[in-house]
């Protein structure tokens, strides 16, 4: 699973996820891309599950780029613990994704293969996604 090697602080505030993605919203590396349509908090497990779904479909063909990284810790208190007593321990890592953000890119495969691979991957992600091709945004 993806996670930062080290961080300045162990815990982070929840914050909000409003607005559109200003950067990272176009196809930069590959020929085809998977772009999110709604805001979400994507965990490292979901990123990895979607990556595995794409790789399983394209087999050894093509090159895949992951354009998001889980850099925010999500904390959780233990089960059956009363409120109070401070913030819980870091449980997992997530990435905040805004609408328009490109999450995965692929090259070296046909458009039909890329479209089907991204369709399989989008079922593993907690938001709606759309397919992009280079030059057609």
UniProtKB/Swiss-Prot annotation:
This protein's GO cellular component annotations are: cytosolic large ribosomal subunit
Q: Does the keyword Ribonucleoprotein apply?
A: yes
The record's comment on protein family reads: Belongs to the universal ribosomal protein uL16 family.
Keyword annotations of the record: Ribonucleoprotein, Ribosomal protein, RNA-binding, rRNA-binding, tRNA-binding
Source species of the chain: Sorangium cellulosum (strain So ce56) (Polyangium cellulosum (strain So ce56))
Q: What does this protein do?
A: Binds 23S rRNA and is also seen to make contacts with the A and possibly P site tRNAs.
- Gene for this protein? rplP
User: Per UniProt, what is one GO molecular function of this protein?
Assistant: structural constituent of ribosome
Under the heading InterPro entries, the entry gives: Ribosomal_uL16, Ribosomal_uL16_bact-type, Ribosomal_uL16_CS, Ribosomal_uL16_dom, Ribosomal_uL16_sf
Quaternary structure?
Part of the 50S ribosomal subunit.
One Gene Ontology term of the biological-process aspect is: translation
Protein name per the record: Large ribosomal subunit protein uL16
Q: Species lineage, top-down?
A: Bacteria, Pseudomonadati, Myxococcota, Polyangia, Polyangiales
Q: Which PANTHER family match?
A: 50S/60S RIBOSOMAL PROTEIN L16, LARGE RIBOSOMAL SUBUNIT PROTEIN UL16M
* CDD domains listed in its UniProt record: Ribosomal_L16_L10e
Instruction: Extract the PROSITE patterns matched here.
Output: RIBOSOMAL_L16_1, RIBOSOMAL_L16_2
């Amino acid at each position: 699973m993806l996670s930062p090697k080290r961080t300045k602080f162990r815990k982070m505030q929840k914050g909000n996820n409003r607005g559109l993605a200003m950067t990272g919203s176009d196809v930069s590396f590959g020929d085809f891309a998977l772009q999110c349509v709604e805001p979400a908090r994507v965990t490292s497990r979901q990123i990895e599950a979607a990556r595995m779904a794409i790789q399983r479909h394209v087999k050894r063909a093509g090159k895949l780029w992951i354009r998001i990284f889980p850099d925010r810790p999500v904390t959780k208190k233990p089960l059956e613990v009363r409120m109070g007593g401070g913030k819980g321990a870091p449980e997992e890592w997530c990435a905040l994704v805004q609408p328009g953000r490109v999450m995965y890119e692929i090259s070296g495969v046909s458009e039909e293969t890329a479209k089907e691979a991204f369709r399989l991957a989008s079922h593993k992600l907690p938001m709606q996604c759309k397919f992009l091709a280079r030059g057609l945004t």
